[in-house]
Each structure stands twice: as C-alpha cells, then as structure tokens.
Amino acid sequence: MREIELNPLDEHMARKMADLAGVTPGTSFFQAVRLVCFAAANGHVCLDLRDYAGQEMSFNYLGSMETIPLPEIDLWIDELASNPLVGDGTNNTPFVLDNKHSRLYLHRYWQYERHLITAFKHLSAAQLNVSTTQADMVKHLFADTSSSEEQQQATQMAGQSQLCIITGGPGTGKTTTIVSIMAMLLTENPEIKIILTAPTGKAAARSEE
C-alpha cells in the first residue's frame, strides 16, 4: 500500500474542486485532484494516472489516515473525462486530461508544457550558418583528450543547431562536452554571451569547475 502525506493546500484544493463539480469528497475525481496537486507540489508537471490506477492508497492528512482503493485506469479516465472541470485543453477548465498518455494536468502546467514544446520545435527547425572550419575546430579541441566519438559528435551538433539535448549517466563526460561546446563557440565568436543554469547545487558546482 502506498502512502502520501497531503498538505493543507492539496486537501483544500480537492475539496473546493469537488464542491464546484458537484461531487462528494471520496470520489475518484476528488482523489485525482489530491494527487495532481501533490505531484505539482513535488516538482512534477502532471500526474501519470497509470502510476496509481488500481492501487490502494493511504492518504495522511494532518495525522488522519484514510485508505482509498483507486479505480482501474480505463474507468478512471472515463470518470475524469465526464467531469465538467476536466477538459482537453481547448476550453478553460481547471484540469486538462491527456487521454493518449493517461496524464492529468493542472491547466497552468499544461500550458507551460505546450509553450515549451512550441519553443523547442521552433528552435529545432532553425538553421544555422555553420562555419566550414567547425569540424577541424572540434578535432583540435579533443586532440589531447581521451574523449569518446559521441562527445565529439555532440559538440559538433551543438554548433549546428539552436537546440541540442545531451544526455548520459554519471561519468560519461557531459560536463567535459559542455566545456568543449563553450570553447568552440568562443573561438568562433569571442564576444558571444553564454548563460549557464543548473538544476541542483551539485550540477552548479560542476559547472563552475
């Protein structure tokens, strides 16, 4: 059995939305609102209903425990889709249901994701004027290192697009690759302005090395 500790905001939001929808606390809609608020408070853009569907949940609110069985995924989605406060994003409803991926969003977070997707598509479609010497520059940057071919490819790709996503596990050379990208960009344009951001203190420390 999974246990979730709710804060007063989660509970108040769920009760307020249940009241607006004309349903009683304890319904599957009520539990979904609890969970999507809990997910947002913990840094998630949405609630993946598949992570909870068909499970027995224990909600802890101010020390009071409540055990609730949640519906199976298909039934849960049907119940949410029929609720007047849940839409598909075309109307201004408090919640947005993504039927295809079984995800429930607070409308504001759904808008954030749409805006980010639009920005990514725009950036990825943009064509850059690539320097004819860029390939030689990348080889020079990695000449005295034990870098992998993938790192060199990532560096070169970063110079060819306005959007480049680099992934890898610990110790795979992501930071080294980023340093090489910056060196390449600065070599091409010493006046370029580079802004670095990091999601965690550890990542920030690595970026400063």
Label every model-predicted segment.
Residues M1-E208:
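Conserved ATP-binding/catalytic motifs of P-loop helicase motor domains
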